[in-house]
C-alpha cells in the first residue's frame, strides 16, 4: 500500500514537472532558455536581419508583441552565447558566432517624465553600459556620453559595437499631442540619438523598436539611413505567433486547452483564431496571433481579454475624443499606406495611432490600386474597445455594470426574444443617472451600436444605405436580420412608419433570414427608451 502511495506521488510530481512554463512577462532570452520556458523560434529572422544589407533597422509593433524579447535575443546572439541557441533555426544557419560588444538601452522607464527627469534617466542608462565595460565618463550631455561610450568600447575591445534601443518612443507617447512638452522631449531624444550617424565607423549593427512611427526629421534628423521593416513582408512574422507556429510549436497546448474546455481540437483552434488572431503587418502577411493573450489563455486554460486588460488605452480614448471619433466608425475602412503607416505626432486623423497601437490591422490589399482594407483584428479588441467607450454614453459605475445586462440581452436575442431584450435595456437605462448629452439622436444611435456590438458574434452597422434612405441600425444574428429606426421625443409608430414607407426591408430581401422591423423612441428628459414596436416582415 505504501509503495502505491509513493508511486502515485511520483506520477503527480512528474506531471507537475512536465507542465509547460510560459514566458508571461519575461522578456529576457537567456532566462527563457535556461529556465526551459516555451520559446517560439524567431531566430531565422534574427539571422536574416543581421545579415541584410542594412545595419540600421527600425521595427514597430504594438505593445506586448515580443519586441523586447527580440532585442534580448539579438543581444545574446551578438554576445556569442551559442549554447542558448541549441536546437533553434539559427544554430544551423550561423557558422562564425563572432562576439561583439553590445550596448542595450531600454526607454521603457522613461515614461511620464519632465525634461530634467528624462535627461537624468538617459545619463543613468548610459551609466549602466559604461559600468558594464569599466568606462568612466563625467560628461553631462547624454549625446556626448553616448558618443564617447561607443568609441571607447570600440577601442577597448577592438570590435565594432552593436547598439540595441528598445521602446525608443516611450518617453514621447504620453505627450505626442502636447505641443509644448513634445517639443522639449523630442529635442532631448533627437540629441541623444544624434551620435549614431557620426559613430557609423565604429558600429556593427543598430536596432530600434517602438510602437509608433515618429517622423524622420523630428527624431532621427541626423540618421537618414534607417531601414523601416515594420511593413516588410519578409519580417511580418518576426513578432507575434503565426498560425503555422501555433499549429506546430504549440500543438500540445491546443490539445490541452480543448481537453480542459471539453471541446474538440478544431473548435479550440477556431476560438483561438476568433479571439486572438487577425493581425497582419504587411500586404502579404500571414495570420498573426497576439502572443501575450495566447500564452495567458494556455496558462489559464480559459479565454479572456488578457492583452486589453494589461494596459488601459487611456491615451487612445482621449485621442478618440480629440478627433471626434464615433464608435460606429471604428472598423472596416479603406486607406493608402500613407494614411496609417505614418508619423503620429502630426496626424490629422486617428488612423495611424489605431493601426500602430494594434487596434486596427491590415485585412486585405488591392495590388492594382494599392488600397488597403483595415479593420479591428479580433473579438478581444472589438469587445475591449467598445467596453472602454461605453462610459462615454453611460455614467461611471453603471457603464461598468452594463456587461451583465448586455450578456442577458444576448441570451434573449439568441432565443428570438427581442422584446424581452429591449425591456431589459429599458430597465437598465432607468438606473443610469441623467446624462447632459442626451438631446441628440446620434448619441442614442452610438450607444445602441456599442451595446449591440458587445453582444458579440453578430454583425452591426449604422447608417446603412438603401435606395430610399439610410437605416439607423442593422443587426444581423444567426437567425434574424433586424432593421432598427430611432426617433427622439416622438413615438415608435413614427419610426416604424419610416421603415415601411421607405421600404427599407427590400434592400435586405436576399439576406436569407427572416426580417424584423423595430421602431424605437427615446425620451431625452429621461435618457431612456420610451416605447418600441416590433413587426415581422
Predicted regions and their residues:
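Conserved catalytic cores of phosphodiester-cleaving nucleases, focusing on short active-site segments
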Residues: 448, 471-488, 502
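Active-site metal-binding core of divalent-cation-utilizing nuclease and nuclease-like domains
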Residues: 153-157, 451-478
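Metal-dependent nuclease catalytic cores in nucleic-acid-processing enzymes
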Residues: 192-199, 352-360, 449-453, 498-518
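Mg2+/Mn2+-dependent nuclease catalytic core
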Residues: 182-188, 488-505
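Phosphate-binding site recognition
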Residues: 2-440, 455-456
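Structural motif
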Residues: 162, 480-482, 516
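Domain-level recognition of nuclease-like catalytic cores that cleave nucleotide substrates
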Residues: 507, 511-537
Amino acid at each position: 500500500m505504501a509503495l502505491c502511495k509513493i508511486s502515485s506521488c511520483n506520477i503527480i510530481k512528474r506531471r507537475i514537472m512536465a507542465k509547460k512554463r510560459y514566458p508571461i512577462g519575461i522578456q529576457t532570452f537567456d532566462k527563457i532558455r535556461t529556465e526551459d520556458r516555451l520559446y517560439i523560434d524567431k531566430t531565422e529572422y534574427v539571422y536574416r536581419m543581421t545579415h541584410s544589407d542594412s545595419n540600421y533597422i527600425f521595427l514597430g509593433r504594438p505593445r506586448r508583441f515580443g519586441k523586447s524579447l527580440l532585442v534580448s535575443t539579438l543581444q545574446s546572439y551578438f554576445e556569442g552565447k551559442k549554447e542558448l541557441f541549441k536546437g533553434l533555426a539559427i544554430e544551423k544557419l550561423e557558422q562564425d558566432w563572432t562576439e561583439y560588444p553590445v550596448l542595450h538601452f531600454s526607454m521603457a522607464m522613461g515614461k511620464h517624465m519632465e525634461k530634467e527627469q528624462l535627461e537624468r534617466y538617459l545619463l543613468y542608462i548610459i551609466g549602466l553600459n559604461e559600468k558594464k565595460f569599466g568606462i568612466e565618463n563625467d560628461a553631462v550631455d547624454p549625446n556626448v556620453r553616448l558618443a564617447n561610450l561607443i568609441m571607447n568600447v570600440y577601442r577597448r575591445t577592438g570590435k565594432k559595437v552593436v547598439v540595441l534601443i528598445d521602446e525608443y518612443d516611450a518617453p514621447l507617447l504620453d505627450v505626442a499631442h502636447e505641443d509644448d512638452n513634445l517639443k522639449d522631449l523630442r529635442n532631448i531624444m533627437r540629441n541623444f540619438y544624434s551620435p549614431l550617424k557620426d559613430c557609423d565607423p565604429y558600429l556593427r549593427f543598430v536596432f530600434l523598436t517602438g510602437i509608433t512611427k515618429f517622423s524622420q526629421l523630428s527624431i532621427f534628423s541626423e540618421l537618414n539611413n534607417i531601414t523601416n521593416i515594420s511593413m516588410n513582408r519578409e519580417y511580418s512574422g518576426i513578432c507575434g505567433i503565426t498560425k503555422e507556429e501555433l499549429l506546430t510549436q504549440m500543438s500540445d497546448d491546443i490539445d490541452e486547452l480543448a481537453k480542459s474546455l471539453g471541446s474538440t481540437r478544431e473548435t479550440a483552434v477556431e476560438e483561438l483564431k476568433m479571439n486572438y488572431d487577425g493581425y497582419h503587418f504587411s500586404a502579404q502577411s500571414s495570420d498573426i496571433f497576439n502572443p501575450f493573450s495566447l500564452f495567458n489563455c494556455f496558462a489559464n486554460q480559459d479565454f479572456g481579454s488578457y492583452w486589453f486588460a494589461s494596459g488601459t488605452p487611456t491615451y487612445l480614448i482621449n485621442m478618440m475624443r480629440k478627433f471626434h471619433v464615433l464608435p460606429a466608425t471604428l472598423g472596416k475602412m479603406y486607406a493608402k499606406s500613407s494614411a496609417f503607416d505614418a508619423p503620429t505626432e502630426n496626424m490629422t486623423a486617428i488612423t495611424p495611432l489605431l493601426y500602430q497601437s494594434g487596434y486596427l490591422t491590415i485585412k486585405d490589399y488591392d495590388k492594382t490600386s494599392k488600397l488597403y482594407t483595415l479593420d479591428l483584428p479580433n473579438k478581444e479588441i472589438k469587445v475591449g474597445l467598445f467596453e472602454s467607450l461605453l462610459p462615454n454614453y453611460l455614467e461611471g459605475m453603471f457603464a461598468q455594470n452594463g456587461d451583465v445586462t448586455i450578456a442577458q440581452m444576448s441570451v434573449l436575442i439568441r432565443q428570438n426574444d427581442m422584446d424581452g431584450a429591449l425591456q431589459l435595456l429599458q430597465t437598465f437605462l432607468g438606473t443610469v443617472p441623467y446624462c447632459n448629452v442626451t438631446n441628440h439622436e446620434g448619441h442614442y444611435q452610438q450607444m445602441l451600436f456599442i451595446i449591440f456590438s458587445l453582444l458579440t458574434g453578430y454583425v452591426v452597422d449604422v447608417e446603412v444605405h438603401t435606395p430610399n434612405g439610410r437605416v439607423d441600425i442593422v443587426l444581423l444574428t444567426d437567425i434574424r436580420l433586424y432593421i432598427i429606426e430611432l426617433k427622439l421625443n416622438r413615438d415608435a409608430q413614427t419610426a416604424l412608419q419610416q421603415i415601411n414607407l421607405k421600404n427599407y426591408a427590400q434592400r435586405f430581401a436576399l439576406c436569407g433570414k427572416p426580417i424584423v422591423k423595430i421602431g424605437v423612441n427615446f425620451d431625452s428628459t429621461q435618457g431612456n427608451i420610451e416605447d418600441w414596436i416590433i413587426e415581422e416582415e
